């Protein structure tokens, strides 16, 4: 009797037909993915993307050259040179470089900064043609901060209750 049932299944291609209908059902179901270059998904406010240096509302850069971000960076991707002290006792950076090739996007630099000068912004589309374009200097970082300031400030404000 068992051989007869097995022969009927083989003759009627029962397993093939069940697999075929399963594939057809999946083929016509809605797709769970998005069409990336044309559609973009929602990015979390805690997303850690391209680095940026922020400015105060009066236009002065926030970084006070404390070098905490350089000290805490596990990948040693940050290099800072502090300028001489100004008349008011503060100091600013002369050189602020981040080697994005070394960076592991851990966010420790952002957490260590006492004035929220260095942040990891919302931009994740910064592919380059050459490796040299991934060595960010102070001007590039300030430009990123100016470009993304509104979104960065909103993300920091929304994340404030959890810090």
Curated annotation (Swiss-Prot):
[4Fe-4S] cluster 1 binds at residues 63, 66, 69, 113. It comes from the Bacteria. Keywords: 4Fe-4S, Cell inner membrane, Cell membrane, Iron, Iron-sulfur, Membrane, Metal-binding, NAD, Quinone, Repeat, Translocase, Ubiquinone. GO terms for cellular component: plasma membrane. The keyword Translocase applies. Its EC number is 7.1.1.-. PROSITE patterns: 4FE4S_FER_1, 4FE4S_FER_2. Belongs to the complex I 23 kDa subunit family. This is NADH-quinone oxidoreductase subunit I. The gene is nuoI.
